[in-house]
Amino acid sequence: MANLLKTVVTGCSCPFLSNLGSCKVLPGKKNFLRTFHTHRILWCSAPVKPGIPYKQLTVGVPKEIFQNEKRVALSPAGVQALVKQGFNVVVESGAGEASKFSDDHYRAAGAQIQGAKEVLASDLVVKVRAPMLNPTLGVHEADLLKTSGTLISFIYPAQNPDLLNKLSKRKTTVLAMDQVPRVTIAQGYDALSSMANIAGYKAVVLAANHFGRFFTGQITAAGKVPPAKILIVGGGVAGLASAGAAKSMGAIVRGFDTRAAALEQFKSLGAEPLEVDLKESGEGQGGYAKEMSKEFIEAEMKLFAQQCKEVDILISTALIPGKKAPILFNKEMIESMKEGSVVVDLAAEAGGNFETTKPGELYVHKGITHIGYTDLPSRMATQASTLYSNNITKLLKAISPDKDNFYFEVKDDFDFGTMGHVIRGTVVMKDGQVIFPAPTPKNIPQGAPVKQKTVAELEAEKAATITPFRKTMTSASVYTAGLTGILGLGIAAPNLAFSQMVTTFGLAGIVGYHTVWGVTPALHSPLMSVTNAISGLTAVGGLVLMGGHLYPSTTSQGLAALATFISSVNIAGGFLVTQRMLDMFKRPTDPPEYNYLYLLPAGTFVGGYLASLYSGYNIEQIMYLGSGLCCVGALAGLSTQGTARLGNALGMIGVAGGLAATLGGLKPCPELLAQMSGAMALGGTIGLTIAKRIQISDLPQLVAAFHSLVGLAAVLTCIAEYIIEYPHFATDAAANLTKIVAYLGTYIGGVTFSGSLVAYGKLQGILKSAPLLLPGRHLLNAGLLAGSVGGIIPFMMDPSFTTGITCLGSVSALSAVMGVTLTAAIGGADMPVVITVLNSYSGWALCAEGFLLNNNLLTIVGALIGSSGAILSYIMCVAMNRSLANVILGGYGTTSTAGGKPMEISGTHTEINLDNAIDMIREANSIIITPGYGLCAAKAQYPIADLVKMLSEQGKKVRFGIHPVAGRMPGQLNVLLAEAGVPYDIVLEMDEINHDFPDTDLVLVIGANDTVNSAAQEDPNSIIAGMPVLEVWKSKQVIVMKRSLGVGYAAVDNPIFYKPNTAMLLGDAKKTCDALQAKVRESYQK
């Protein structure tokens, strides 16, 4: 049995397991009884995972012994990551001292400190430099490696065959960090790029140190200082890093490369790309340029000779894999430069690009300072070690993704750009057998990959296909149809009163359109709340139809009283909630307010009317005009924070004046007045109670509930008006118009009522937020619509009361069912559009009442609210790049979606802990926070507000970026942040802040996904293609705070999770925000 087990173990493909067969049993001091259960191993049907548990493996980090080498293979953060994964880590004493990492730092991260021999004998050894002779121990490091162990290091196998022979004798498996394929999936573990990035930056710093003038140009009292001119040859990682650093220091930067893509990158950094007249592509393999033709090189030399006479600093990075670096600048060119110039040769280790370079030295040749250091990354040891450590930890996690066992498989058959390609390219020796170089992968892209057109480019091409004639013809057709419709209304008008009402409706709609567009997005929530309150003027319709004495005496009067009661809930509750929200936007530095003084115009308006009425004047129509203008002022007042409270006051004055004018025109008896007052008082009391108790985070469902009341009031009013007017239809010339408007108002009110209730249920959590996609729902909705439209035929044709009231009852039921089926098919994340559409419906229902009762006030206010909701719906749809029909019918996909296969997202994500996040926050000077609905759901606005306050006190620039559809109703996040005390002037909209992301040090994404998804711009086939998003990935660093890597509402994977500048801080949003707040406070109190 022992032999059988030994055979199984030694035959395993993972080199660590082969050691288990030859392990020694150490004698112990006590005797133990051990039962050897073989049957569970031999006959168990459960599959056995390949590899070896992480907890049984030790990772060793030796001290680098190469001369002047200051780097270390793993930073304390890297150690912590491996320990968290399950590895045991041992670090040689003093290994990180030159990189400013003490032994105590490593101990705190979970590592053990041991000697060189013990560390090198680990299962897996990670190094920076390749193994070499240890002069202190008098033995080669390769001879100290564990037999059949694994080594990860820079190896350069083509240049070090002797080293490979030594490693082969130890049966080592070797992963060469210099052989990581330069493919997209491997960007996170490309150590050559990491080191080149540091070398490029350090080259500019050294050049500036040895250059005798400023880099940036200056005009001083002592004279003008011209900017330094820098030429950078080679647009790889090092060259681009140099260009970015030099440009940020104010120099004039020029860049040269044989590859067109590299020249574009130079241009994007603000450098001037240089080209020769001869056109020849320099695209090579593995991220390097190819060798060029003789003619091209001659033209290149001519360009360089000219540039040497002009520039002050030369930085060259040109390399050819496996060969000596090409000489690009001869001695004559260098000597033609101005005295005091500096040249930095980043290719010095491979011989150098300058004929005058002395590798590893700094010297001056005829007044030109030459920097030929070959250890530039080591001269920034802390940063270099941190990046190299990140490369290694990401590589280990990528090649062995299993959570329990360490295992990877080396295959000779693999596709280009896959993990199989990465593993096979990186592993240069397996179990002592040299397998370098790797075989050619399959499916290699031919030449440079075709650049996929962005969504913006596709949209521009689509727009270009529309000819000016077609564009003008479309516009002319729209105006023709509109004017034809107006002519039709004039011909069909039964009387002059209808034409006047249409005129009022049209002008009010235009005024509302232009007024609402001026409202700042931050005040969209108060706007919806105040329109909710104003829509309570459906009470006017109820008052006009009320009758009886202390109690209603007929069915129609009872319906009217109920409509008045319901509308009063809206009025009182809506204005109080609006006032609460606006009070939250107050800042401590704002001047005092005396809003009670607006009682003066309110008293003058209402009191003056009552005095005029007592004097015998009938000025109800003028009162309606004044009330309508006040309602316009209410919407206009919300255009800015400074006038928002005035707007709410004007809304109250307008509604109060309208109700007073209605009562004055009716002149009810005392008993009926008592009934009216009682209905309004009871409704108002209930509305105030609800508004006082509601939490601001529950505002969307409150708005939805209030919308349902408006819809129900419209239905009740229309049915009551039909019942009251029915006896007069035979002699009334406008009877048909009255019937049509009553039928239309009933339909709109029914959809608004039931749709709002479903929206309320979804937002409150009573109903599931997910869309309810009934089979054949479109046919069902079409049938309900056909039934509703068809019902008007018998309603208009049959003059009997029974038929009429039956048709109104039927359309009420059908529209209510349709409101349910439509809204239930819409997911919770689309509720902003649903609420704004319902808001618009409530306005059109109010207009229908205005036409029905021939009331100018209801028509004016209804047009305002209807246009307000329509504009907000349009804004929401534009923010999602979706059509209104797509949202309302429960559809998916934007108007720009191409319909092909979405791009595949590959790569690994980076996870950090709270301490890492605090370090990033502490180091950042400019921070943007982009919250999503997750912030609302977790109610994490308070710790975030306190965090922002602390960071601002430390001199950091902290702002918020809000997407229009980030919450569950327009402007919800603005109100929540205001509630927590965040000043509104640091809360910016998407269009205001998107251009600032490239200059931002850190972005905190809290509970957002689709609104920051780069697939909207990068993938034309994505269902969110073309959707405007917050471009957070353009910042220097992003921290995404989410529960998991799961998709958002649109069910689209987010590429930013896998971008190299993104770190994932996973966990509950509220707990994470609380912890961040506490950690930041603790760090600043030290």
UniProtKB/Swiss-Prot annotation:
Stretch forming the transit peptide: 1-43
Major localisation: mitochondrion
Modified residues (N6-succinyllysine): 117, 224, 294, 331, 1079
SUPFAM superfamilies, per database record: DHS-like NAD/FAD-binding domain, Formate/glycerate dehydrogenase catalytic domain-like, NAD(P)-binding Rossmann-fold domains
Keyword set, alphabetical order: Acetylation, Membrane, Mitochondrion, Mitochondrion inner membrane, NAD, NADP, Nucleotide-binding, Transit peptide, Translocase, Transmembrane, Transmembrane helix
Membrane topology: Multi-pass membrane protein
Gene Ontology cellular component annotations, sorted alphabetically: mitochondrial inner membrane
Residue sites binding NADP(+) per the record: 933, 965-970, 1009-1011, 1026-1027, 1042-1049, 1068-1069
InterPro entries in the cross-refs: Ala_DH/PNT_CS2, AlaDH/PNT_CS1, AlaDH/PNT_N, AlaDH/PNT_NAD(H)-bd, DHS-like_NAD/FAD-binding_dom, NAD(P)-bd_dom_sf, NADP_transhyd_a, NADP_transhyd_a_C
Spans within the Mitochondrial matrix topological domain: 44-474, 579-595, 880-1086
EC class name: translocase
One Pfam short name: AlaDh_PNT_C
One annotated GO molecular function: proton-translocating NAD(P)+ transhydrogenase activity
Tree of life domain: Eukaryota
Subcellular localization: Mitochondrion inner membrane
Gene Ontology biological process terms in this record: NADPH regeneration; reactive oxygen species metabolic process
Biological role: The transhydrogenation between NADH and NADP is coupled to respiration and ATP hydrolysis and functions as a proton pump across the membrane. May play a role in reactive oxygen species (ROS) detoxification in the adrenal gland.
Family as reported in the entry's similarity comment: In the N-terminal section; belongs to the AlaDH/PNT family.
Complexes and interactors: Homodimer.
Annotated protein name in UniProt: NAD(P) transhydrogenase, mitochondrial
UniProt source species: Bos taurus
